[in-house]
């Protein structure tokens, strides 16, 4: 199981993980409303363990995404919920949650205390942590945490903000060299940077690097593609794949989302993705 400590926006990622017939545990909060109940019901239907999801007033915040006529994200605003109930869950039940997990998926722009507690537990039980970001203005303040993530996934613009450089207009080849140099000098374990239709570049602190092209598919709706990509990378690395192979899994899951109007990936068996994992009933 992968354990995800995150706000409601990461519900899609936990569903993507569950749709590869894995059994993730979701550590989060939801509203005390009918909408909150519906979220939990849907996650349970996907065979997600929701034992550590707390219902609190205003627990899901408000999220608005604006898309242009090509279906690409043009802007977004958000009102974040109070996430401290997640910290209380980790303080009370963190040992049992993390000790049973195969790895941890963590939102980087979550409260610092939650990040610190998660890393503390991950270190205690020798678990890998994979990071992703939604609110860049908050995440950039947490830049010093990058070296604690076994792998971090972001897009081209976010990577530019992290490294205080402008990557607009860079080719995949150019960006790959730049990211590799930055990752090696900053001693960040590994990073994957998505480039939309141009695919993704990846690099680790040992100097391994590469480019993985996007799959040529008919684009119906890009909503959720980044979440599926990240879920695929985290799944691959959790179960022993090299960075390139993990990016390949992420690319496949992202393509499966883009070609439909659904914002989560369809069901896959682990063996279809080259994963030698027994599926739990």
What are these regions (language model features)?
Residues 169-281:
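Conserved phosphate-binding/catalytic region of the ribokinase-like
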Residues 32-33, 109-113, 134-138:
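Short beta->alpha connector loops
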Residues 18, 116-126:
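Surface-exposed amphipathic alpha-helices with a cationic face
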Residues 12-23, 236-240:
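Alpha-helix C-terminal capping segments
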Residues 19-102, 271-281:
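Conserved N-terminal subdomain of the carbohydrate kinase-like
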Residues 1-6, 10-13:
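Single conserved hydrophobic/aromatic residue that forms the stacking wall/gate
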Residues 123-128, 133-209:
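Conserved phosphate/ATP/ADP-binding segment of small-molecule kinases
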């Amino acid at each position: 199981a992968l354990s995800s400590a995150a706000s409601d926006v990461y519900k899609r990622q936990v569903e993507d993980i569950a749709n590869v017939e894995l059994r993730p545990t979701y550590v989060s909060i939801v509203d005390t409303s009918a909408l909150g109940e519906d979220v939990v019901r849907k996650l349970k239907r996907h065979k997600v363990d929701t034992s550590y999801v707390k219902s609190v007033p205003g627990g899901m915040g408000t999220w608005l995404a604006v898309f242009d006529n090509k279906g690409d994200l043009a802007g977004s605003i958000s009102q974040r919920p109070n996430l401290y109930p997640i910290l209380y869950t980790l303080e009370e039940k963190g040992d049992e949650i993390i000790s049973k997990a195969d790895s941890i998926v963590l939102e980087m722009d979550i409260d610092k205390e939650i990040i610190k507690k998660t890393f503390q537990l991950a270190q205690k039980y020798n678990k890998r942590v994979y990071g992703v970001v939604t609110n860049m203005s908050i995440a950039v303040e947490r830049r010093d945490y990058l070296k604690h993530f076994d792998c971090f996934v972001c897009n081209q613009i976010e990577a530019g903000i992290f490294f205080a450089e402008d990557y607009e207009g860079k080719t995949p080849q150019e960006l790959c060299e730049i990211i590799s140099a930055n990752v090696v000098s900053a001693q960040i374990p590994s990073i994957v940077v998505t480039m939309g239709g141009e695919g993704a570049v990846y690099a680790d602190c040992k100097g391994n690097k590469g480019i993985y092209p996007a799959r040529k598919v008919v684009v119906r709706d890009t909503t959720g593609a980044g979440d599926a990509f990240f879920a695929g990378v985290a799944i691959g690395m959790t179960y022993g794949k090299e960075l390139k192979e993990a990016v390949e899994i992420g690319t496949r899951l992202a393509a499966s989302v883009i070609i439909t109007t659904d914002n989560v990936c369809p069901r896959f068996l682990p063996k279809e993705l080259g994963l030698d994992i027994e599926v739990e009933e």
